[in-house]
């Protein structure tokens, strides 16, 4: 598979680079990295691997852009400075969502525009918790499992989003921390 011309130079600089994520009218406009052997390598490193408290956006090791996963899970810090994924919190406001229904995630192989289907706050669960774990979904075994994931996300959203997803659609999940 050929790498898009617009990303070839970035990929030559760092083979961990897998794409670019941006959301209009936010500070979210960053490269996305992935390291198969060390999922959190970029949690406190910049694009070049140097220390950075903000880190760089990175995809979960269970996500794949080569054989596209049903869901690509991308992590980023919620920086008080407004950088990285801080502006995801704007989706708590329905008016913001209504004016920003689309997210651009281009991989090194192709461009992708994703329509927002859910926006919510949750927590990382303890082992014994039986609650919905959005961060464990990558590939659905069947339509039922896919629909269960989408329904779980929509149920946590504080306002109504009419957009639906169907089995076979490609999803991205953007995940950050709250403080």
Regions found by a protein language model. Give the residues of each.
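Solvent-exposed, non-transmembrane regions of membrane-associated and secreted proteins
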Residues: 1-179
